[in-house]
């Protein structure tokens, strides 16, 4: 097991701008700053929650880490070595992204088993479809079903299984339980917690809902209008929030 005291992934002075669209024949005059001077670390064996309202920049941050956003400045390190998100083919298996929309994330023409088997073959894994499904608490018969035949919770488990198939060290989970009912949310969160413990994963858990992470994450980062307004241990943030925005989120949660 690697040293968990050093960050597996760090983001330093990240800023992201998107160009404003000009009107008709007017040239673009300015840019919208979506993220401003973002700094944080992820640690193996730890769940870090990134919390903020819709439009705060959470998904943009996650997308930038894995190279889905081009207009950024800042530095990224994986295991202490700098990397370029726009040229990270060597890290594709190390950092996996799980999206909110579990249905569109899966190929509708492939069964769950075909989807997983394709990944296992490409990466010459010693795992098999049944063992990967078992790790996410799904029965073998799920392998023969198409995405539209699965429940939302089952589809999200298949997406988690697909990420696990390449044996990653970091998972970015983007609102992965927001479309599920409360009972299914709890089961998925328990699954993620177990996987963190068993696989020593580092998790960036993106959510708008503090209720989801209050007893789930070790650390919380609060994002508002593209800026980190507060970060610290989950206990510190939940019991003694310092920033007004964080206080507002917690008050809304308790109401």
Question: Which residue ranges define each predicted feature?
Answer:
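Conserved ABC ATPase "signature" region
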Residues: 126-141, 250-251
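ABC ATPase "signature
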Residues: 231-232
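Helix-to-loop junction immediately C-terminal to a conserved catalytic motif
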Residues: 66
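Conserved ABC ATPase signature
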Residues: 146-150, 154
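Conserved ABC transporter NBD signature motif
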Residues: 74-83, 91
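A short, surface-exposed alpha-helical micro-motif characterized by mixed small hydrophobic
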Residues: 213-215
């Amino acid at each position: 097991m690697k040293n968990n005291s050093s960050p597996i992934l760090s983001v330093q002075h990240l800023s992201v701008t998107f160009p404003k669209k000009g009107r008709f024949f007017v040239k673009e005059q300015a840019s919208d700053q979506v993220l401003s001077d973002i700094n944080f670390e992820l640690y193996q064996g730890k769940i870090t929650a990134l919390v903020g309202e819709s439009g705060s920049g959470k998904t943009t941050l996650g997308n930038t880490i894995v190279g889905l956003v081009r207009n950024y400045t800042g530095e990224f390190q994986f295991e202490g070595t700098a990397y370029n998100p726009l040229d990270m083919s060597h890290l594709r298996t190390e950092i996996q992204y799980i999206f909110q929309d579990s249905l569109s994330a899966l190929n509708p023409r492939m069964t769950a088993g075909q989807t997983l088997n394709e990944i296992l073959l490409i990466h010459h894994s010693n795992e098999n479809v049944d063992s990967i499904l078992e790790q996410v608490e799904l029965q073998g018969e799920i392998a023969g079903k198409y995405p539209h035949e699965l429940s939302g919770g089952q589809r999200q488990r298949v997406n988690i299984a697909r990420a696990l198939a390449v044996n990653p060290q970091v998972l970015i989970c983007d609102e992965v339980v927001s479309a599920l009912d409360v009972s299914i949310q709890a089961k998925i969160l328990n699954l993620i917690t177990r996987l963190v413990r068993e696989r020593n994963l580092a998790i960036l858990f993106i959510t708008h809902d503090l209720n989801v992470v209050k007893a789930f994450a070790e650390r919380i980062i609060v994002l508002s209008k593209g800026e980190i307004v507060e970060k610290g241990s989950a206990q510190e943030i939940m019991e003694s929030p310092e920033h007004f925005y964080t206080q507002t989120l917690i008050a809304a949660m308790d109401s």
